[in-house]
Amino acid sequence: MATNIRKTHPLFKIINNSLIDLPTPANISIWWNFGSLLGMCLIIQILTGLFLAMHYTADISSAFSSVAHICRDVNYGWLIRNIHANGASMFFICVYLHIARGLYYGSYLNKETWNIGVVILLLLMVTAFVGYVLPWGQMSFWGATVITNLLSALPYIGDTLVQWIWGGFSIDNATLTRFFTFHFLFPFVTAALTMIHLLFLHETGSNNPTGLTSNTDKIPFHPYFTYKDLVGFFILLFLLTLLALFTPNLLNDAENFIPANPLLTPPHIKPEWYFLFAYAILRSIPNKLGGVLALVFSILILLLVPILHTSKQRSLTFRPITQILFWLLVTNTIILTWIGGQPVEQPFITIGQIASITYFSFFLILFPIAGWWENKMLNL
Protein backbone atom coordinates (compact mmCIF):
# COMPACT_ATOMS: atom_id res chain seq x y z
CA MET A 1 0.00 0.00 0.00
CA ALA A 2 1.36 3.46 -0.94
CA THR A 3 2.26 5.61 2.06
CA ASN A 4 0.65 9.00 2.33
CA ILE A 5 3.02 11.88 1.47
CA ARG A 6 1.83 13.89 4.48
CA LYS A 7 3.22 11.17 6.75
CA THR A 8 6.60 10.79 5.00
CA HIS A 9 7.63 14.22 3.63
CA PRO A 10 9.94 15.96 6.18
CA LEU A 11 7.96 19.24 6.16
CA PHE A 12 4.44 17.86 5.70
CA LYS A 13 5.14 15.38 8.51
CA ILE A 14 5.60 18.25 11.00
CA ILE A 15 2.38 19.94 9.81
CA ASN A 16 0.56 16.59 9.90
CA ASN A 17 1.64 15.84 13.47
CA SER A 18 0.69 19.35 14.60
CA LEU A 19 -2.61 19.99 12.80
CA ILE A 20 -4.01 16.83 11.20
CA ASP A 21 -3.21 13.56 13.00
CA LEU A 22 -2.53 15.24 16.36
CA PRO A 23 -4.13 13.10 19.11
CA THR A 24 -6.52 15.46 20.89
CA PRO A 25 -8.68 14.86 24.00
CA ALA A 26 -12.24 14.14 22.84
CA ASN A 27 -13.83 16.25 25.57
CA ILE A 28 -12.10 19.64 25.12
CA SER A 29 -14.65 22.46 25.07
CA ILE A 30 -14.95 25.74 23.16
CA TRP A 31 -12.43 27.27 25.62
CA TRP A 32 -9.70 25.33 23.78
CA ASN A 33 -10.58 27.27 20.61
CA PHE A 34 -8.71 30.42 21.64
CA GLY A 35 -5.22 29.14 20.79
CA SER A 36 -6.12 28.81 17.11
CA LEU A 37 -8.07 32.10 17.25
CA LEU A 38 -4.92 33.82 18.52
CA GLY A 39 -2.99 32.33 15.61
CA MET A 40 -5.57 33.79 13.23
CA CYS A 41 -5.44 37.18 15.01
CA LEU A 42 -1.65 37.23 14.66
CA ILE A 43 -1.87 36.49 10.93
CA ILE A 44 -4.53 39.21 10.45
CA GLN A 45 -2.40 41.73 12.38
CA ILE A 46 0.78 40.90 10.44
CA LEU A 47 -0.98 41.14 7.04
CA THR A 48 -2.89 44.37 7.76
CA GLY A 49 0.22 45.81 9.44
CA LEU A 50 2.32 44.99 6.39
CA PHE A 51 -0.04 46.93 4.10
CA LEU A 52 -0.19 49.85 6.55
CA ALA A 53 3.63 49.94 6.73
CA MET A 54 3.75 50.38 2.93
CA HIS A 55 2.02 53.76 3.27
CA TYR A 56 3.05 54.90 6.76
CA THR A 57 5.86 57.44 7.32
CA ALA A 58 7.86 57.10 10.55
CA ASP A 59 8.63 60.81 10.90
CA ILE A 60 7.13 63.17 13.48
CA SER A 61 6.33 65.82 10.86
CA SER A 62 4.32 63.46 8.67
CA ALA A 63 3.30 60.38 10.77
CA PHE A 64 -0.12 61.79 11.72
CA SER A 65 -0.74 62.97 8.14
CA SER A 66 0.33 59.61 6.70
CA VAL A 67 -2.30 57.82 8.83
CA ALA A 68 -4.93 60.31 7.60
CA HIS A 69 -3.66 59.72 4.04
CA ILE A 70 -4.05 55.94 4.48
CA CYS A 71 -7.66 56.41 5.63
CA ARG A 72 -8.58 58.95 2.93
CA ASP A 73 -6.55 58.20 -0.20
CA VAL A 74 -5.33 54.59 -0.15
CA ASN A 75 -7.70 52.01 -1.66
CA TYR A 76 -9.51 50.42 1.31
CA GLY A 77 -6.90 52.03 3.58
CA TRP A 78 -9.66 52.98 6.05
CA LEU A 79 -10.69 49.31 6.23
CA ILE A 80 -7.14 48.01 6.69
CA ARG A 81 -6.47 50.58 9.43
CA ASN A 82 -9.78 49.86 11.21
CA ILE A 83 -9.19 46.10 11.08
CA HIS A 84 -5.64 46.54 12.41
CA ALA A 85 -6.67 48.87 15.26
CA ASN A 86 -9.70 46.82 16.31
CA GLY A 87 -7.89 43.55 15.58
CA ALA A 88 -5.55 44.45 18.45
CA SER A 89 -8.57 44.64 20.78
CA MET A 90 -9.89 41.28 19.58
CA PHE A 91 -6.37 39.86 19.98
CA PHE A 92 -6.21 40.90 23.64
CA ILE A 93 -9.76 39.68 24.35
CA CYS A 94 -8.68 36.26 23.05
CA VAL A 95 -5.38 36.44 24.99
CA TYR A 96 -7.14 37.16 28.30
CA LEU A 97 -9.74 34.44 27.70
CA HIS A 98 -6.93 32.00 26.77
CA ILE A 99 -5.07 32.82 30.02
CA ALA A 100 -8.31 32.57 32.04
CA ARG A 101 -8.91 29.12 30.52
CA GLY A 102 -5.37 28.11 31.54
CA LEU A 103 -5.94 29.32 35.10
CA TYR A 104 -9.36 27.66 35.43
CA TYR A 105 -8.43 24.24 34.05
CA GLY A 106 -4.91 24.04 35.49
CA SER A 107 -3.15 24.14 32.10
CA TYR A 108 -0.36 26.06 33.85
CA LEU A 109 0.95 22.72 35.17
CA ASN A 110 2.46 22.26 31.69
CA LYS A 111 5.17 24.59 33.00
CA GLU A 112 7.24 25.09 29.83
CA THR A 113 4.16 25.88 27.72
CA TRP A 114 2.84 28.26 30.41
CA ASN A 115 6.15 30.09 30.88
CA ILE A 116 6.70 30.68 27.17
CA GLY A 117 3.07 31.87 27.06
CA VAL A 118 3.86 34.53 29.69
CA VAL A 119 6.87 35.63 27.60
CA ILE A 120 4.57 35.89 24.54
CA LEU A 121 2.13 38.00 26.61
CA LEU A 122 4.90 40.42 27.65
CA LEU A 123 6.10 40.71 24.05
CA LEU A 124 2.52 41.33 22.86
CA MET A 125 2.10 44.10 25.42
CA VAL A 126 5.33 45.80 24.30
CA THR A 127 4.30 45.42 20.64
CA ALA A 128 0.86 46.96 21.28
CA PHE A 129 2.41 49.80 23.29
CA VAL A 130 4.95 50.82 20.61
CA GLY A 131 2.22 50.46 17.97
CA TYR A 132 -0.05 52.86 19.85
CA VAL A 133 2.67 55.53 19.57
CA LEU A 134 2.88 55.36 15.76
CA PRO A 135 -0.16 57.52 14.74
CA TRP A 136 1.56 60.36 16.69
CA GLY A 137 -1.65 61.74 18.16
CA GLN A 138 -1.88 63.37 21.60
CA MET A 139 -2.47 60.13 23.49
CA SER A 140 0.28 58.40 21.46
CA PHE A 141 2.82 61.05 22.47
CA TRP A 142 1.80 61.46 26.10
CA GLY A 143 1.24 57.74 26.64
CA ALA A 144 4.78 57.10 25.36
CA THR A 145 6.13 59.90 27.58
CA VAL A 146 4.46 58.59 30.74
CA ILE A 147 5.24 54.89 30.24
CA THR A 148 8.86 55.27 29.08
CA ASN A 149 9.43 57.76 31.91
CA LEU A 150 8.58 55.01 34.41
CA LEU A 151 11.95 53.42 33.68
CA SER A 152 13.64 56.46 35.23
CA ALA A 153 12.47 55.06 38.59
CA LEU A 154 15.09 52.31 38.32
CA PRO A 155 17.97 53.08 40.67
CA TYR A 156 21.29 54.23 39.19
CA ILE A 157 20.64 53.29 35.52
CA GLY A 158 17.10 54.73 35.19
CA ASP A 159 17.79 58.16 33.64
CA THR A 160 20.43 56.83 31.26
CA LEU A 161 18.11 53.99 30.21
CA VAL A 162 15.24 56.38 29.42
CA GLN A 163 17.49 58.64 27.31
CA TRP A 164 18.84 55.56 25.55
CA ILE A 165 15.29 54.40 24.67
CA TRP A 166 14.25 57.92 23.60
CA GLY A 167 17.38 58.42 21.51
CA GLY A 168 17.74 61.91 23.00
CA PHE A 169 16.59 64.07 25.89
CA SER A 170 12.90 63.86 25.03
CA ILE A 171 10.51 61.85 22.88
CA ASP A 172 11.39 62.89 19.35
CA ASN A 173 11.90 61.63 15.81
CA ALA A 174 14.48 59.03 16.90
CA THR A 175 11.92 57.56 19.33
CA LEU A 176 9.21 57.27 16.69
CA THR A 177 11.60 55.65 14.18
CA ARG A 178 12.80 52.99 16.63
CA PHE A 179 9.26 52.32 17.89
CA PHE A 180 8.18 51.70 14.28
CA THR A 181 11.14 49.33 13.85
CA PHE A 182 10.19 47.41 17.01
CA HIS A 183 6.51 47.32 16.05
CA PHE A 184 7.43 45.82 12.68
CA LEU A 185 9.87 43.27 14.12
CA PHE A 186 8.14 41.97 17.27
CA PRO A 187 5.12 40.25 15.62
CA PHE A 188 7.55 37.98 13.76
CA VAL A 189 9.36 37.22 17.03
CA THR A 190 5.92 36.51 18.53
CA ALA A 191 5.21 34.09 15.66
CA ALA A 192 8.51 32.29 16.37
CA LEU A 193 7.71 32.07 20.11
CA THR A 194 4.25 30.73 19.21
CA MET A 195 5.95 27.85 17.37
CA ILE A 196 7.98 27.10 20.53
CA HIS A 197 4.75 27.39 22.59
CA LEU A 198 3.16 24.73 20.34
CA LEU A 199 6.30 22.59 20.42
CA PHE A 200 6.15 22.42 24.22
CA LEU A 201 2.38 21.85 24.16
CA HIS A 202 2.70 18.87 21.81
CA GLU A 203 5.35 17.34 24.08
CA THR A 204 2.70 16.82 26.78
CA GLY A 205 -0.52 17.00 24.76
CA SER A 206 -3.51 19.21 25.53
CA ASN A 207 -5.13 19.37 28.95
CA ASN A 208 -8.92 18.81 29.15
CA PRO A 209 -11.81 20.16 31.29
CA THR A 210 -11.65 17.32 33.83
CA GLY A 211 -7.92 17.79 34.47
CA LEU A 212 -7.53 13.99 34.28
CA THR A 213 -5.33 12.12 31.81
CA SER A 214 -7.01 11.70 28.43
CA ASN A 215 -4.62 9.15 26.90
CA THR A 216 -7.41 6.55 26.77
CA ASP A 217 -9.78 8.83 24.86
CA LYS A 218 -8.14 10.78 22.04
CA ILE A 219 -9.30 11.60 18.53
CA PRO A 220 -7.47 13.11 15.53
CA PHE A 221 -7.43 16.91 15.36
CA HIS A 222 -8.70 16.82 11.76
CA PRO A 223 -11.59 16.78 10.92
CA TYR A 224 -13.13 17.10 14.40
CA PHE A 225 -11.38 20.17 15.76
CA THR A 226 -10.51 21.84 12.46
CA TYR A 227 -14.25 22.29 11.84
CA LYS A 228 -14.93 23.14 15.47
CA ASP A 229 -12.23 25.85 15.28
CA LEU A 230 -13.69 27.16 12.00
CA VAL A 231 -16.90 28.04 13.87
CA GLY A 232 -14.80 30.17 16.24
CA PHE A 233 -12.99 31.76 13.27
CA PHE A 234 -16.27 32.84 11.69
CA ILE A 235 -17.62 34.25 14.97
CA LEU A 236 -14.40 36.20 15.59
CA LEU A 237 -14.28 37.52 12.01
CA PHE A 238 -17.95 38.51 12.26
CA LEU A 239 -17.35 40.44 15.51
CA LEU A 240 -14.18 42.07 14.13
CA THR A 241 -15.97 43.09 10.92
CA LEU A 242 -18.89 44.44 12.95
CA LEU A 243 -16.49 46.51 15.06
CA ALA A 244 -14.35 47.73 12.13
CA LEU A 245 -17.29 48.69 9.90
CA PHE A 246 -19.93 50.03 12.28
CA THR A 247 -18.13 51.42 15.34
CA PRO A 248 -14.44 51.64 14.33
CA ASN A 249 -13.63 54.29 16.96
CA LEU A 250 -15.58 52.74 19.85
CA LEU A 251 -12.40 51.59 21.62
CA ASN A 252 -10.17 54.49 20.50
CA ASP A 253 -9.39 57.57 22.56
CA ALA A 254 -10.79 60.75 21.00
CA GLU A 255 -7.62 62.55 22.14
CA ASN A 256 -5.65 60.64 19.49
CA PHE A 257 -7.45 62.52 16.70
CA ILE A 258 -5.44 65.57 17.76
CA PRO A 259 -1.84 65.71 16.41
CA ALA A 260 0.86 65.30 19.09
CA ASN A 261 1.66 68.55 20.90
CA PRO A 262 4.48 68.49 23.49
CA LEU A 263 3.20 71.82 24.93
CA LEU A 264 -0.34 70.64 25.69
CA THR A 265 -1.03 67.79 28.13
CA PRO A 266 -4.35 65.90 27.75
CA PRO A 267 -6.63 66.04 30.83
CA HIS A 268 -6.48 62.25 31.36
CA ILE A 269 -3.53 60.24 30.08
CA LYS A 270 -4.49 56.58 29.77
CA PRO A 271 -3.47 53.59 27.63
CA GLU A 272 -5.73 51.42 25.47
CA TRP A 273 -8.47 49.55 27.38
CA TYR A 274 -6.55 46.25 27.44
CA PHE A 275 -3.79 47.76 29.62
CA LEU A 276 -6.07 49.61 32.03
CA PHE A 277 -6.01 46.90 34.74
CA ALA A 278 -2.19 47.07 34.92
CA TYR A 279 -2.30 50.89 34.69
CA ALA A 280 -4.70 50.99 37.67
CA ILE A 281 -2.27 48.85 39.71
CA LEU A 282 0.58 51.20 38.71
CA ARG A 283 -1.38 54.30 39.80
CA SER A 284 -2.61 52.81 43.06
CA ILE A 285 0.89 52.90 44.59
CA PRO A 286 2.05 56.41 45.59
CA ASN A 287 5.76 55.55 45.16
CA LYS A 288 7.12 55.64 41.58
CA LEU A 289 9.46 52.63 41.81
CA GLY A 290 6.84 50.70 43.82
CA GLY A 291 4.27 51.39 41.12
CA VAL A 292 6.61 50.19 38.36
CA LEU A 293 7.38 46.98 40.28
CA ALA A 294 3.65 46.37 40.91
CA LEU A 295 2.97 46.92 37.19
CA VAL A 296 5.62 44.39 36.16
CA PHE A 297 4.60 41.85 38.82
CA SER A 298 0.92 42.11 37.84
CA ILE A 299 1.97 40.11 34.75
CA LEU A 300 4.99 38.19 36.09
CA ILE A 301 2.85 36.81 38.94
CA LEU A 302 1.49 34.36 36.35
CA LEU A 303 4.90 32.64 36.49
CA LEU A 304 4.28 31.84 40.17
CA VAL A 305 0.90 30.15 39.58
CA PRO A 306 2.35 26.64 38.88
CA ILE A 307 4.63 26.91 41.95
CA LEU A 308 1.75 27.99 44.23
CA HIS A 309 -0.59 25.19 43.09
CA THR A 310 -1.48 23.26 46.26
CA SER A 311 -4.51 21.21 45.21
CA LYS A 312 -4.41 17.49 44.48
CA GLN A 313 -6.73 18.17 41.56
CA ARG A 314 -5.61 19.94 38.42
CA SER A 315 -8.80 21.60 37.18
CA LEU A 316 -11.36 23.75 39.01
CA THR A 317 -14.21 21.65 37.56
CA PHE A 318 -14.68 19.79 40.87
CA ARG A 319 -13.41 22.54 43.23
CA PRO A 320 -16.31 24.88 44.15
CA ILE A 321 -14.38 27.06 46.65
CA THR A 322 -11.57 27.90 44.21
CA GLN A 323 -14.20 28.38 41.49
CA ILE A 324 -15.78 31.18 43.53
CA LEU A 325 -12.33 32.73 44.06
CA PHE A 326 -11.58 32.48 40.33
CA TRP A 327 -14.74 34.40 39.38
CA LEU A 328 -13.98 36.96 42.09
CA LEU A 329 -10.54 37.41 40.47
CA VAL A 330 -12.22 37.96 37.08
CA THR A 331 -14.56 40.55 38.66
CA ASN A 332 -11.60 42.17 40.41
CA THR A 333 -9.71 42.50 37.10
CA ILE A 334 -12.79 44.09 35.47
CA ILE A 335 -12.99 46.58 38.38
CA LEU A 336 -9.28 47.40 37.89
CA THR A 337 -9.93 47.96 34.16
CA TRP A 338 -12.74 50.39 35.01
CA ILE A 339 -10.60 52.22 37.61
CA GLY A 340 -7.71 52.56 35.14
CA GLY A 341 -9.93 54.66 32.89
CA GLN A 342 -11.13 56.97 35.69
CA PRO A 343 -9.47 60.23 36.83
CA VAL A 344 -7.12 60.10 39.85
CA GLU A 345 -9.57 61.26 42.54
CA GLN A 346 -11.66 59.78 45.33
CA PRO A 347 -13.34 57.31 45.52
CA PHE A 348 -11.45 55.83 42.54
CA ILE A 349 -8.06 55.99 44.31
CA THR A 350 -9.26 53.91 47.27
CA ILE A 351 -11.18 51.43 45.09
CA GLY A 352 -8.06 51.00 42.92
CA GLN A 353 -5.85 50.38 45.96
CA ILE A 354 -8.25 47.79 47.42
CA ALA A 355 -8.62 46.07 44.02
CA SER A 356 -4.82 46.01 43.56
CA ILE A 357 -4.25 44.41 46.97
CA THR A 358 -6.96 41.79 46.34
CA TYR A 359 -5.55 41.07 42.83
CA PHE A 360 -2.20 39.98 44.30
CA SER A 361 -3.89 38.32 47.31
CA PHE A 362 -5.83 35.93 45.04
CA PHE A 363 -2.63 34.58 43.47
CA LEU A 364 -0.31 34.64 46.50
CA ILE A 365 -2.64 33.78 49.41
CA LEU A 366 -6.24 32.84 48.59
CA PHE A 367 -5.76 30.26 45.78
CA PRO A 368 -3.04 28.28 47.67
CA ILE A 369 -5.11 28.30 50.90
CA ALA A 370 -8.30 27.24 49.06
CA GLY A 371 -6.41 24.37 47.39
CA TRP A 372 -5.05 23.20 50.73
CA TRP A 373 -8.50 23.48 52.35
CA GLU A 374 -10.15 21.47 49.56
CA ASN A 375 -7.50 18.75 50.00
CA LYS A 376 -8.40 18.60 53.71
CA MET A 377 -12.11 18.32 52.91
CA LEU A 378 -11.44 15.46 50.46
CA ASN A 379 -9.89 13.52 53.35
CA LEU A 380 -12.93 13.93 55.65
Swiss-Prot record:
Binding site for heme b b562: H84, H183
GO molecular function terms listed in the Swiss-Prot or TrEMBL record: metal ion binding; ubiquinol-cytochrome-c reductase activity
UniProt GO BP: mitochondrial electron transport, ubiquinol to cytochrome c
Keyword set, alphabetical order: Electron transport, Heme, Iron, Membrane, Metal-binding, Mitochondrion, Mitochondrion inner membrane, Respiratory chain, Transmembrane, Transmembrane helix, Transport, Ubiquinone
Miscellaneous comment text of the record: Heme 1 (or BL or b562) is low-potential and absorbs at about 562 nm, and heme 2 (or BH or b566) is high-potential and absorbs at about 566 nm.
PANTHER family: CYTOCHROME B
The name this protein goes by in its record: Cytochrome b
